[in-house]
Amino acid sequence: SCSLVGSEMCIRDSIGGNGFAAILKNGGNKTVLFRADMDALPIKEETGISFESVKTTKQNGMDVPIMHACGHDIHMTSLIGTAEYFSKNKDSWKGTIVFILQPAEEIGFGARQMINAGLFKKIPYPDINLALHVSAQTQSGTVHITPGFAMANVDSVDVTFYGEGGHGAYPHLTKDPIVMSSQFITTVQTIISRNLSPINAGVVTVGSIHGGTKHNIIPNHVDLQITVRSYSDEDRELIISRIKKIAESIAIQNDLPKNLYPIVKLRDEYTPAVFNNPDLAMRAKEILSKELGKDKVFDGPQVMGGEDFGQFGRVEPKIPSLLFWIGAVSQKDYKEFLNNSKKLPSLHSSKFLPDYEKTIDTGISSSIALIEAHLCLLYTSPSPR
């Protein structure tokens, strides 16, 4: 943020912790919010480059290595480069640009904390929100745009099954929470296949099971951790409701007293879906096709990953928003990948190494083009979602 602090911008820092806003005003009546996330990941970098991360942080009282394994360094650099361009070329545009540097995206809290700390009372209210994200599976120099739902709602659910433990040789004298958990794990998969519309998408993944201590002991409880992914609010509510009902029905099937019914807890970690305003997405494709070339701009797929940028568009009144993907794979690596001779490191991999110069150039040029188009009225304001 030093590059922004030293400029003529109005600075708002420490918003919801380490959140940061820089406001660049230049007359006009249009306002664009451009956001980049900042946080790194607790991963030891293994890319072998000369500027490989050697930084550490404290996690649970221990020193752990960190690196930018999700491209947030590219995001920040693209934002700063975009800000420098608009600061130095004020004759070519009118309006207001709000540059947001957001912490804690990886844990899903950063955007919410900034909003709860009054972000939108500290800045001019935007007409549109923009953000970008690197892609570890597409070639540098390209852009991918997904109209409508682009990334998923993310929920974390904890379920504890209780029973009456005892000796493994005498299961008829117990109420076995391991068997109940097994019933639950298979049954919740029918939520997606039988309760959700086949046209829609969702995920219920049981990622953690903890129960029992020894071969011949039936435990008193089993703990499950579940990630739930969905797109619409209606599907999200349906999936969570069915998880609760299935857990309770299994308790009833096993003649458990009500004081031993399973506990289903929805963690306060909800990340809303990223919804790309369709009008904004369509116009962005047109603008970037002119800026980069039609052969560089593609329709992007919906993904079940989460991104808390969606929070910025859900404030009232709602703000049309767009998150677009920029390719980060070098031409050489991408060709080898297409020939099945190379596997590409994914985001969150210790070996993730973007083709940084070309990726940053694309991030900056794309962001400038989209912001200028809105401020200079090259297209009309998109209708609300």
Q: What kind of feature is each model-predicted range?
A:
Residues 179-381:
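Metal-dependent amide/peptide-bond hydrolase catalytic core
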Residues 21, 41, 55-67, 73-74, ...:
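Histidine/acidic-residue-rich, glycine-tolerant segments that coordinate divalent metal ions
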Residues 61-70, 350-358:
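Short pre-catalytic strand/loop immediately N-terminal to key active-site residues, enriched for Gly-Thr
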